[in-house]
Amino acid sequence: MEMEHINENTIRVLIGNEDLADRGITFLDLLGNHKDVENFFYSILEEVDVEDEFQGSEAVTFQVLPKNDGLELFISKNVAMDDLSSLEGLSEVNADVSELIRKQIEADKAAADELDEMEATDETNRNVIFELDNFEAMIQLSKEVFMQSVLTNLYTYNDRYYLQVLFLTDELEKTNVDNEIAQILEFAHKTTVTQDTLVEYGTCIMERSALELTRYYFND
């Protein structure tokens, strides 16, 4: 595991696959429960002996980028939307990092409003749950099916993967929804598992944009 300071507010940690294996964690795990993953991130801070630099910070953000031999972890403190220009120096590592951070911070701020919108429009929207044989099926689905006016959540439950698709039917014709469901069923199956069951007993590992996230992180 290697660490370097990008600037006074951001460090980059290179974590190899062997490092992840030693901790019993995979990249997919890092897309799961925020509280559990945060503990992992802070343990990394302790290991690279810079945790004191981040103590007392009002905001600490963790951004993960996959690599063939592991992942890059960017840890930033006190990053405000207006200060993201200071991250432009990351372009030599990955030209899209600063924009990715910006989008993820914006997504976090919009999450509560978006979930409220889902609940408020539930009666008019069409909510469908699909079961996937494995995560590889999810990857293939993300590569072949492109949809607009949908929200997608990916859950694990009883060692299976479930994709929840909320079709915003006020923006989609019923025929379009039926066609998109037919496309999804080429990679998934119908299921009797309900949203309530997944929320109560399952684990949401990708929220709101599961197809887009899978396509971004697992695009060969």
Swiss-Prot record:
Pfam families in UniProt:
MecA
Protein origin, superkingdom:
Bacteria
**Where would you find the membrane-spanning parts of this chain?**
none
Gene Ontology terms for molecular function: protein-macromolecule adaptor activity
Q: Which family does it belong to?
A: Belongs to the MecA family.
Q: What does this protein do?
A: Enables the recognition and targeting of unfolded and aggregated proteins to the ClpC protease or to other proteins involved in proteolysis.
Identify the PANTHER family for this entry: ADAPTER PROTEIN MECA, ADAPTER PROTEIN MECA 1
What is recorded about the protein's domains? The N-terminal domain probably binds unfolded/aggregated proteins; the C-terminal domain interacts with ClpC.
Q: How does it assemble?
A: Homodimer.
Protein name from the UniProt record: Adapter protein MecA
Question: Which source organism does the UniProt entry give?
Answer: Enterococcus faecalis (strain ATCC 700802 / V583)
- Write the lineage as a comma-separated list: Bacteria, Bacillati, Bacillota, Bacilli, Lactobacillales
